[in-house]
Amino acid sequence: MDDIFNMTVPIVVENNGRNERAYDIYSRLLKDRIVLLGTEVNDQVASLICAQLLFLESQDPEKEIYLYINSPGGSVTAGLAIYDTMNYITPNVATVCMGRAASMGALLLAAGEKNMRYALPNSQVMIHQPLGGYQGQATDIDIHAREILRMRQRLNEILMEQTGQSLEKVAQDTERDYFMTAEDAKAYGLIDKVLVSRKDLDIEHEKTE
């Protein structure tokens, strides 16, 4: 999240006729129940995303939340914290990929509420197995290798559950980087619809009401 704060964050000023109020752009989006994951997934980012999801649930436990994703992925444990929170809260969480959803970003995209998982036309989606790189004593390396295999199995199981693909196919496809277009991701079961315009999303929203 440091990358966000190192940038100039736009400020939005709202005037209701009696007074003005300034918001940073992310806080303003939060008012409309929009959460943006636009960076690598790490512990700090996961904490912020989870906090926003929990806050929006406390504001209205019935109204859906929109999670927009443009992420290269990142920490598995941080990503699973977001995944578990999405499932834990009461509101449905719709996911929208813009740009790319890779690795944990792809898993979070697929974790959206069924029939509420979207991607914009030129989005790129990529799935693969967890990356290792631990260095140390042989026994510690063995421990971490077994943990990576356990995580890989769990991530494959989640993708199987979310896509409807067989565990064997998911394991085969994630053996190496597996890139997909938005239409490919729809065919694979990672998303439900490719959105061309806001009108498409509004139509889908009306269907779910």
Swiss-Prot record:
Catalytic residues identified in the record: 103 (nucleophile), 128
Alphabetical list of InterPro entries matching this protein: ClpP (IPR001907), ClpP/crotonase-like_dom_sf (IPR029045), ClpP/TepA (IPR023562), ClpP_His_AS (IPR033135), ClpP_Ser_AS (IPR018215)
Any Pfam family: CLP_protease
Keyword check for Oxidoreductase: no
Organism domain of life: Bacteria
Catalytic activity: Hydrolysis of proteins to small peptides in the presence of ATP and magnesium. alpha-casein is the usual test substrate. In the absence of ATP, only oligopeptides shorter than five residues are hydrolyzed (such as succinyl-Leu-Tyr-|-NHMec, and Leu-Tyr-Leu-|-Tyr-Trp, in which cleavage of the -Tyr-|-Leu- and -Tyr-|-Trp bonds also occurs)
Subcellular localization, as worded in the UniProt entry: Cytoplasm
Catalytic activity, EC: 3.4.21.92
GO biological process: protein quality control for misfolded or incompletely synthesized proteins
Signal sequence extent: none
Gene3D superfamilies: 2-enoyl-CoA Hydratase, Chain A, domain 1
The entry's keywords: Cytoplasm, Hydrolase, Protease, Serine protease
Classification via PANTHER family: ATP-DEPENDENT CLP PROTEASE PROTEOLYTIC SUBUNIT
NCBIfam families given in the database record: clpP, PRK00277.1, PRK12553.1
Function: Cleaves peptides in various proteins in a process that requires ATP hydrolysis. Has a chymotrypsin-like activity. Plays a major role in the degradation of misfolded proteins.
Subunit structure: Fourteen ClpP subunits assemble into 2 heptameric rings which stack back to back to give a disk-like structure with a central cavity, resembling the structure of eukaryotic proteasomes.
Family: Belongs to the peptidase S14 family.
Protein name as annotated: ATP-dependent Clp protease proteolytic subunit
Gene name per UniProt: clpP
